Structures are given as structure tokens and as C-alpha cells.
């Protein structure tokens, strides 16, 4: 006689975030002597591994999360999937940088090795959370079959610096909101965000130190253009993505638009400590154009309209040419 056993099916999900690669030989040639002391200090902080025992699941996870209403569960699954894939992407990049730089630039290699450790820890923790909702990522498959986007080394540093800093502000903002309003903490992963975000912050500081070791990357007219470009790219990407996922933020008691503007302003303030210019994110036209861009993007997703796509690019151009804020003169006074 056969016994019927009801099991939960775990779906292997393949996502489509960006995975990056770069010119490792060129990166190996970079001279970091101009800011070596700061880089060494940050690597020493990495060695201490403050979060070694932080990412351990406790009894709060021991619930049947698949009984959550399907609409809510779907938003959580997507949040966890996107977060896990982003962390895993960072792990792959940092691990490869550590391996390639081991012989030519051992200090940077050590720093990237510690950051890959952190990212792997984050990705693994998120993947376990995904299993609570009946989903998991085949990280080995992702490693072998992902398409990689090539970025020149200095662009990798701009992009990852901002990615880590915006990640810090996202995590700490969610944590502080739920700490103040615990009734919205509907899943226990958020209580880990306070220490988790410190990993992101330290990673951002490491990239900032590398950028400062190459003064031409943060001074001069070309660097001003590139800093504006990457700031705008990161802010617009987050804004368009999050406004498409308002329901998730409502689940945890946040307004997606207000949350994003807070994160944008805080990340812009952080970047002002490093970049020679930042965006005037409080300019009335900046706010208006961001909203117009989001509306055009939502319409394009529904219709694939060429006019909507043209509207998006027009908004992006207008956003880019808004006069930036000169921060270089304030570097010695910003706290």
C-alpha cells in the first residue's frame, strides 16, 4: 500500500539582475600608495569580522510562512529573490577580484576577499529565507550560466561604492522604521538589518578609499560628469523599481515614494563626502522629472510604447543637466 505524503515543492528560480566583470589586469596595476593607510585601516576592520555570528536563524523563523496570503507571499518572495541575487552578484565579483589581485596587489585582494565573505553570508541567509516561502536559488547554476556586463575598473568603483552606500541607507531605514513600529515587522529577517547594513557601509568605505587613492577619479571635469551619471543611474533605477513594488512596502508600513526620497537624500549626502559634485535632489524640477520618468516607465511596461520610451530618455537627459551641487569645497567641513 502506498502512503500519500504532502510535500512543499521548492522552485528553482532564475532571475535577471546584472552580474559584472572588469579588466582585472588593469586593476592590478593601480597604485594605492596615496591612500594606503586608510585602505589598511578598513581592511583591518574587515579582519575583525564583527558579524561572524550574526546571521543565525532563531525560533522566530520556525513558522509555516507558506500560509501567508498568496498576494503578500508573492511580494516577499520577489523581495528576497532580488536581494539574494544582488548579494550573490557582489560575492562573485569580489571573489574574482580577490583571486586575480592576490599576487599583484595583496592588500586590495585581502579586502575584496573579506567583502566576498560578507556577501556570501548575506546571500546564504537570504536563500534560507526564500526556502520559507517555497523558493530557492540555484547559486551554482547562476555562477555558471549568468551573462556578465563589462565595466571598466573605475566605473566598477563608482557603481559599487554607490550600490553599497544606497544599500546601507535602505537597510537602516527599514530597520529603524520597524523598530519604531514593530506591528509592521511581519517577517523576522528585518531585525537583522541593523548589523547587516554595517557590512554595506564598510564595503562602501573601502571603495571610497580606493577612489581617493586615484585623485583623478574624483577631481576634474570628467570625474564630475561620471559622478553625476552614476548617481542618477542608481537613483533612477531604485525609484523605478520600487514604485512598481508599492505593495511590498505597504506590507511593512512604508510608503515607497517617501522611503525612496529619504534614501536618495541620505545617499546623496554620503556621496558628497567623496564626489566633487552631487545631484540637486531637492530641486523642484528634479522631483517632478523623477515622477514623470516613473509614470512613463509604468506606461512603457504595459504598452511597450516607443513614445513612452522616448519620454523616459527625455526625462533622464533633463535630470542630468540640472545644475549639480559643488561639494569639493566642503570636503573638509562635511561631517
UniProtKB/Swiss-Prot annotation:
A GO BP entry is: photosynthesis
Enzyme Commission number, as recorded: 1.14.13.81
Q: Which cysteines are joined by disulfide bonds?
A: none
Q: What class of enzyme is it?
A: oxidoreductase
Q: Name one GO cellular component term.
A: chloroplast inner membrane
Please indicate which superkingdom the organism of origin belongs to.
Answer: Eukaryota
Instruction: Mention one GO molecular function.
Output: magnesium-protoporphyrin IX monomethyl ester (oxidative) cyclase activity
| Entry keyword Plastid | yes
Q: Where in the cell is it found?
A: Plastid, Chloroplast
Catalytic activity annotation? Mg-protoporphyrin IX 13-monomethyl ester + 3 NADPH + 3 O2 + 2 H(+) = 3,8-divinyl protochlorophyllide a + 3 NADP(+) + 5 H2O
Q: Which keywords belong to this entry?
A: Chlorophyll biosynthesis, Chloroplast, Iron, Metal-binding, NADP, Oxidoreductase, Photosynthesis, Plastid
- Pathways per UniProt: Porphyrin-containing compound metabolism; chlorophyll biosynthesis (light-independent)
Q: Which HAMAP family match?
A: AcsF
Its protein name is Magnesium-protoporphyrin IX monomethyl ester [oxidative] cyclase
Amino acid at each position: 500500500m502506498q502512503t500519500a505524503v504532502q510535500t512543499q515543492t521548492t522552485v528553482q528560480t532564475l532571475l535577471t539582475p546584472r552580474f559584472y566583470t572588469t579588466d582585472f589586469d588593469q586593476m592590478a596595476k593601480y597604485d594605492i600608495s596615496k591612500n594606503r593607510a586608510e585602505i589598511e585601516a578598513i581592511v583591518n576592520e574587515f579582519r575583525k569580522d564583527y558579524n561572524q555570528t550574526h546571521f543565525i536563524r532563531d525560533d522566530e523563523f520556525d513558522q509555516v510562512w507558506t500560509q501567508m496570503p498568496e498576494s503578500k507571499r508573492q511580494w516577499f518572495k520577489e523581495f528576497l529573490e532580488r536581494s539574494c541575487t544582488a548579494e550573490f552578484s557582489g560575492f562573485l565579483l569580489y571573489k574574482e577580484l580577490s583571486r586575480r589581485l592576490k599576487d599583484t596587489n595583496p592588500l586590495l585582494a585581502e579586502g575584496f576577499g573579506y567583502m566576498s565573505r560578507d556577501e556570501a553570508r548575506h546571500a546564504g541567509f537570504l536563500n534560507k529565507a526564500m526556502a520559507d516561502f517555497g523558493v530557492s536559488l540555484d547559486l551554482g547554476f547562476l555562477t555558471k550560466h549568468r551573462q556578465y556586463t563589462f565595466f571598466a575598473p573605475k566605473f566598477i568603483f563608482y557603481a559599487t561604492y554607490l550600490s553599497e552606500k544606497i544599500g546601507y541607507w535602505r537597510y537602516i531605514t527599514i530597520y529603524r522604521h520597524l523598530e519604531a513600529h514593530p506591528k509592521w515587522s511581519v517577517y523576522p529577517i528585518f531585525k537583522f538589518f541593523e548589523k547587516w547594513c554595517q557590512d554595506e557601509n564598510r564595503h562602501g568605505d573601502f571603495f571610497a578609499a580606493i577612489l581617493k587613492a586615484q585623485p583623478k577619479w574624483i577631481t576634474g571635469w570628467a570625474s564630475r560628469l561620471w559622478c553625476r551619471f552614476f548617481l542618477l543611474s542608481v537613483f533612477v533605477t531604485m525609484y523605478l523599481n520600487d514604485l512598481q513594488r508599492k505593495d511590498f512596502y505597504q506590507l511593512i508600513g512604508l510608503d515607497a515614494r517617501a522611503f525612496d526620497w529619504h534614501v536618495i537624500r541620505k545617499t546623496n549626502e554620503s556621496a558628497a563626502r567623496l564626489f566633487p559634485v552631487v545631484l540637486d535632489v531637492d530641486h523642484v524640477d528634479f522631483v517632478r522629472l523623477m515622477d514623470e520618468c516613473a509614470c512613463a516607465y509604468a506606461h512603457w511596461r504595459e504598452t511597450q510604447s516607443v513614445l513612452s520610451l522616448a519620454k523616459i530618455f527625455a526625462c533622464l537627459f533633463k535630470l542630468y543637466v540640472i545644475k549639480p551641487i559643488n561639494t569639493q569645497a566642503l570636503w573638509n567641513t562635511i561631517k
